[in-house]
Amino acid sequence: MMMHNRRAMTLYNLFPLLAGPFSRWGEHFTRAAAMGFDWVFVNPIQRPGASRSLYSIADYFGFNPALLDPQSTTPPAEQVRQMVSQARASGLRLMIDLVINHCAIDSPLTREHPEWFVREPDGRVSSPFCLENGQKVVWHDLAQFDHHHTRDPEGLYRYCLSVVEHLLALGFQGFRCDAAYQVPPNLWQRLIQEIKSRHLHTCFVAETLGCSADQTRDTAQSGFDYVFNSSKWWNFQDWWLIEQYNLVRETTRSISFPESHDTPRLCQEVNGNLNAVKQWYLFSALFSAGVMMPIGFEFGFRKPLHVVNTSPADWEKTDADLTSYIAKVNAIKKGHFVFHEESPTNMFPYQNPNILIMWKASAKHRDEALLILNKDPQHHQEFSTDQFRRFVQSGAPLRDVSPEYALEYIHEPFHYSLRPGQGLVLVTSRM
């Protein structure tokens, strides 16, 4: 097992356009480390095409002018290395987007290597698309690489490999692989194996937004260390999340997130209810082996991140500060093996439908845990049980390690009025 897989994956998404030039990122690294994050994921920093979208990369070896210090005479690559050094000084590892499903439609690559791209019947370079509510949505600023049928598969593969080696040389140690399921599994398998043969502890994470559970599993089998799961869209009730979790967990680990750069801000979705924001972070952190949150989540930001239009001027002044709470949740995650892995997990039915009872047991250690969560972020909800043995296998006493209002002793029979959105985190060890 790789070194990075021995502990929980805690990932802070520093969105480059909101953070501004690399020289200003230090304060965000300091805050991320203080909250207990080990990794910082940054979206693409390469030079974009005419659309200016972060994900429309025109030059994989150049840098986005919006992220460079205009007053500095330091070469761009050195500015990146200095930023990486700041992250490492804070005890953080850096992950970056790897975008090899497509590039910018105006990238020189479309002229220099026309054989690398999917073509329309009339010969034009194809743009990737998706279907939303039955409607075809085309990203006209993108050109789709033809990994499946190119006449020069080795040349295209070697180019992708050189991009990864370039980013590793800058100091990045992990890759969030954008639209991973749209790239052939055999390419991922070869790329990951070749990189890890030279850089053993490199971490690869598959972004699989919008694909089926089977596609997620098939992508995971290509050698990825983690995939992103769909817990963000769960309603705390339906069984599909556990089915998806169980389908993938034997293959690799997964990462939950309460919001991302692709979704609305959670604080906006819940109309500023911080009980709901805390509720979702606690669940996301403890449900799967990994957790990710984007910059600004800790302050209850409401304005969505945008891959073209976001700027440092969009930094919000709020009255919310969840940094201490997030640090406590991350400490719980790191402190118990059961939250480091894709543990066997079950949801127990309960007489009060507003209470979620999630059981987890480590497959590799003796840890066992219960999360008793008030689904209702507006009202108190009552939980009671004569004994906890109906929920856990261990006969050892339960300990309350909750991030807030932890109980010194767990009595039986047990009765507790959960505050709005509150979660009890109880742990024990099987004998």
Model-derived regions, located:
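Acidic/aromatic-lined carbohydrate-recognition and catalytic surfaces
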Residues: M2-R151, G155-S162, H166-A169, R176, ...
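A structural motif
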Residues: F37, A169-F172, F224, A289-G290
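Glycoside hydrolase catalytic-domain groove-lining segments
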Residues: S230-E259
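Aromatic/acidic polysaccharide-binding cleft in carbohydrate-active enzymes
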Residues: T252-A320
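Aromatic- and carboxylate-lined catalytic core of secreted/periplasmic carbohydrate-active enzymes
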Residues: F301-M347
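Carbohydrate-binding surface patches
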Residues: F348-F391
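Solvent-exposed beta-hairpin/edge-strand motifs
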Residues: Q387-Y405
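C-terminal beta-strand-rich structural cap/linker in extracellular carbohydrate-active enzymes
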Residues: Y409-M431
